[in-house]
């Protein structure tokens, strides 16, 4: 057989943290562009995901990468993998 290193086949998404009010959970807004079938215009579609944040380290406005994982609760089956860009503080 092949003794190569296993790679993760879990889905990853990049989105912005819109809420961190829950304990060990952040709400991540993921946006993607879809071409309208009739008019041809690109429309922004979005979806919110609850992601596991074990240490409560991520704040609103942070750009994070989330990775699919086993279900942690009724609505949470994603975990924050890494911080892509921290929120700008004004």
From Swiss-Prot:
Keyword rRNA-binding applies: yes
Molecular function GO labels: rRNA binding; structural constituent of ribosome
GO cellular component entries: cytosolic small ribosomal subunit
InterPro entries: NA-bd_OB-fold, Ribosomal_uS17, Ribosomal_uS17_bact/chlr, Ribosomal_uS17_CS
NCBIfam families attached to this UniProt entry: PRK05610.1, uS17_bact
Keywords: Ribonucleoprotein, Ribosomal protein, RNA-binding, rRNA-binding
Pfam family, one: Ribosomal_S17
Superkingdom classification of source: Bacteria
Description of how the protein assembles with itself and partners: Part of the 30S ribosomal subunit.
Family: Belongs to the universal ribosomal protein uS17 family.
Protein purpose: One of the primary rRNA binding proteins, it binds specifically to the 5'-end of 16S ribosomal RNA.
Protein name from the UniProt record: Small ribosomal subunit protein uS17
GO terms under biological process: translation
């Amino acid at each position: 057989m092949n003794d190569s290193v296993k790679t993760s086949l879990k889905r990853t998404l990049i989105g912005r943290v819109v809420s961190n009010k829950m304990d060990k959970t952040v709400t991540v807004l993921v946006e993607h562009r879809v071409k309208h079938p009739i008019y041809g215009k690109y429309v922004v579609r979005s979806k919110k995901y609850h992601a596991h944040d074990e240490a409560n380290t991520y704040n609103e406005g942070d750009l994070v990468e989330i990775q699919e994982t086993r279900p942690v609760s009724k609505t949470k089956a994603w975990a924050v993998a890494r911080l892509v860009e921290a929120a700008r503080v004004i």
